[in-house]
Amino acid sequence: MSDKPAYLTRDGRARLEAELEELVTKGRKEIAERINAAKELGDISESGEYEDAKNQQAHLEGRIREIKSILARAQIIDEENGSNHEVRIGSRVTVRIDGEHEEETWTIVGSTEAKPSEGKISNESPIGAALLGKRPSQQVTVETPSGTMKLTILNIQ
């Protein structure tokens, strides 16, 4: 696992803690019951049910390790004390993309919370990384997988 910080909002941390609790309590119990039920059916060497349950167990344990690692490296973003002078993780940024009339508003979050469809972009994404440290009215050129974009920062919250 990585040693770099995992930037999370307070809500993001709470969601991960709730997911971890669910996986450790209910998830493990349900899979253990499925494994035991498959064993009771007899020969497990050719049991698809047993193999499926063991695969799900491995997936669940991997997710538990991943969440524990993220929480251990968590650095909480204080969204309420943000600066409107410079883009940072936790900032809500409104931009205009050159050649378009509409404005886009994104919140810069850590990679574990990124959901572009909800307007949350990672600080590690090309756009998120290019916006960090910039100020209102600055123009930014970003190389993305779909080509070069030119953005003008209109507002930072």
UniProtKB/Swiss-Prot annotation:
GO molecular function ontology, one term from the record: RNA polymerase binding
Keyword Transcription: yes
Keywords: Coiled coil, DNA-binding, Transcription, Transcription regulation
InterPro entries in alphabetical order: GreA/GreB_C_sf, Tscrpt_elong_fac_GreA, Tscrpt_elong_fac_GreA/B, Tscrpt_elong_fac_GreA/B_C, Tscrpt_elong_fac_GreA/B_fam, Tscrpt_elong_fac_GreA/B_N, Tscrpt_elong_fac_GreA/B_N_sf
Pfam families associated with the record: GreA_GreB, GreA_GreB_N
Recorded family membership: Belongs to the GreA/GreB family.
HAMAP family on file: GreA_GreB
Function recorded in the entry: Necessary for efficient RNA polymerase transcription elongation past template-encoded arresting sites. The arresting sites in DNA have the property of trapping a certain fraction of elongating RNA polymerases that pass through, resulting in locked ternary complexes. Cleavage of the nascent transcript by cleavage factors such as GreA or GreB allows the resumption of elongation from the new 3'terminus. GreA releases sequences of 2 to 3 nucleotides.
Designated name of the protein: Transcription elongation factor GreA
Native species: Roseiflexus castenholzii (strain DSM 13941 / HLO8)
